[in-house]
């Protein structure tokens, strides 16, 4: 068998094969013999069908089987012998199969790039300075108050305000004609929730129980009903009831509602401040990591296989869909499809692939590997984060080789990032100064 390898570019190879005629003939005979065992042709017993009839009825299938066998055997053998590291499946081009003649075909496949990483020490990056905003804790307490609030009747003469719950009747008309789906009775709406057409809720502010008024709005251009989209409408509104939120007082009793450990409001505030600081530190470090990897990529431009980019884009898509599902949302609700998402974030996927390849090269060059002790410690972190029993988590990762390999690969990458960060020139600056 003759094999030659062409470099289409740094990440794509073309393997050309010529398989000898005697090998082709042997495979053809073997394929016919196998088909003959099971061939069912009227007038002949299985295994006794003449070869001429088998060729007539099964010649096309035979050719497919032979080509498949020849390609599989020769391609994987050549990949191993040539020391190639393919990404994905090859694109096969071949001549027609003819018994008694050699079989020629080519296999074009993307391969992992040979990464010669450089200039990964002394990278200049900026890090956001940690600045604690006390208003965040106040805002969080306000959210907690809102969550524990109860609705009570508004005082007599109360003018509706944002945040109030208003019960009302409405009828919508266009050019004086009421339209289908534009009316309701005893409809309840929280002003400021954004559930109605833009401008509708704002015009209800200031109304009192018993008010009868007309609200003028324009349906958005992209409104779901094409008959209404972009058109003006008048809504007759009759206010029947207004309820206001009654917020619990911020005191020690309020704090105790969130756990026995919060005996005082100050303890609750301290915990919220601690959580906010931890979140800010995590965000700042994640953004620093992104800048560090971006700086590494700028020093080491490289081509990456499209198959790896496809794979990363698919992983990003699945992760996003899971996150949206946890929030009872979907891509469709965001106005996107699987394909449009992957197209929009393809460049991000490409940069992530570049970063992973470069970090892997740094780890290889610096002999960076997570230790067994670090692996055990990470299992404890996972157990704590997922609120699972440590023994259960340990069993999962020690019996699932793929899960363990993925975790070890992530830990290796994290250690490579830390190695580069320890040797980087990091400048802390206020958030406002970061571009």
From Swiss-Prot:
One of its GO terms (molecular function) is peptidyl-prolyl cis-trans isomerase activity. Keywords: Cell cycle, Cell division, Chaperone, Cytoplasm, Isomerase, Rotamase. InterPro entries: PPIase_dom_sf, PPIase_FKBP_dom, Trig_fac, Trigger_fac_C, Trigger_fac_C_sf, Trigger_fac_ribosome-bd_bac, Trigger_fac_ribosome-bd_sf, Trigger_fact/SurA_dom_sf. Its main location: cytoplasm. GO terms for cellular component: cytoplasm. Its EC number is 5.2.1.8. It is found in: Cytoplasm. GO terms for biological process: 'de novo' cotranslational protein folding; cell division; chaperone-mediated protein folding; protein transport; protein unfolding. It catalyses: [protein]-peptidylproline (omega=180) = [protein]-peptidylproline (omega=0). Residues 163-248 form the PPIase FKBP-type domain. The keyword Isomerase applies. Consists of 3 domains; the N-terminus binds the ribosome, the middle domain has PPIase activity, while the C-terminus has intrinsic chaperone activity on its own. NCBIfam families: tig. Belongs to the FKBP-type PPIase family. Tig subfamily. Involved in protein export. Acts as a chaperone by maintaining the newly synthesized protein in an open conformation. Functions as a peptidyl-prolyl cis-trans isomerase. HAMAP family: Trigger_factor_Tig. This is Trigger factor. It comes from Citrifermentans bemidjiense (strain ATCC BAA-1014 / DSM 16622 / JCM 12645 / Bem). The lineage of its organism: Bacteria, Pseudomonadati, Thermodesulfobacteriota, Desulfuromonadia, Geobacterales. The gene is tig.
């Amino acid at each position: 068998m003759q094999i030659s390898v062409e470099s289409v570019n740094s990440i794509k190879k073309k393997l050309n094969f010529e398989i000898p005629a005697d090998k082709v003939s042997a495979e053809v005979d073997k394929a016919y013999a196998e088909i003959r065992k099971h061939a069912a042709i009227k007038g002949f017993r299985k295994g006794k069908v003449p070869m001429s009839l088998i060729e007539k009825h099964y010649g096309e299938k035979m050719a497919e089987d032979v080509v498949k066998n020849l390609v599989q055997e020769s391609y994987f053998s050549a990949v191993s012998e040539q020391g190639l590291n393919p990404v994905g499946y090859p694109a096969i081009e071949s001549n027609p199969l003819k018994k008694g003649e050699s079989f020629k075909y080519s296999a074009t496949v993307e391969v992992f790039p040979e990464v010669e990483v450089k200039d990964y020490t002394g990278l200049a990056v900026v890090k956001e300075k940690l600045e604690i905003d006390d208003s965040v804790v106040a805002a969080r307490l306000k959210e907690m108050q809102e969550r524990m609030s109860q609705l009570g009747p508004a005082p007599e003469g109360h003018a509706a305000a944002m945040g109030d719950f208003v019960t009302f009747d409405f009828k919508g008309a266009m050019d004086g004609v009421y339209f289908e789906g534009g009316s309701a009775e005893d409809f309840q709406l929280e002003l400021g929730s954004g559930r109605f057409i833009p401008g509708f809720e704002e015009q209800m502010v200031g109304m009192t129980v018993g008010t009868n008024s007309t609200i003028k709005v324009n349906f958005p251009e992209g409104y779901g009903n094409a008959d209404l989209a972009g058109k003006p409408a008048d809504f007759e509104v009759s206010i029947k009831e207004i309820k206001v939120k009654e917020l619990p007082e911020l005191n020690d009793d309020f704090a105790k509602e969130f756990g026995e450990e919060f005996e005082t409001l100050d303890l609750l505030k301290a915990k919220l401040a601690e959580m906010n600081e931890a979140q800010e530190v995590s965000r700042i470090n994640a953004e620093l990591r992104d800048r560090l990897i971006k700086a590494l990529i700028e020093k080491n431009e490289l081509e990456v296989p499209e198959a790896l980019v496809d794979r990363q884009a698919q992983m990003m898509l699945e992760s996003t869909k899971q996150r949206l599902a946890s929030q009872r949302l979907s891509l469709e609700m965001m106005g996107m499809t699987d394909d449009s998402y992957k197209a929009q974030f393809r460049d991000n996927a490409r940069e992530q692939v570049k970063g992973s390849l470069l970090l892997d090269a740094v780890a290889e060059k610096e002999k960076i590997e997570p230790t067994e002790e670090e692996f055990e410690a990470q299992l404890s972190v996972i157990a704590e984060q997922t609120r699972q029993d440590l023994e259960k988590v340990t069993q999962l990762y020690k019996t699932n080789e793929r899960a363990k390999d993925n975790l070890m690969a992530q830990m290796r990458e994290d250690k490579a990032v830390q190695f580069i960060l320890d040797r980087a020139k990091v400048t802390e600056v206020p958030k406002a100064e970061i571009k």
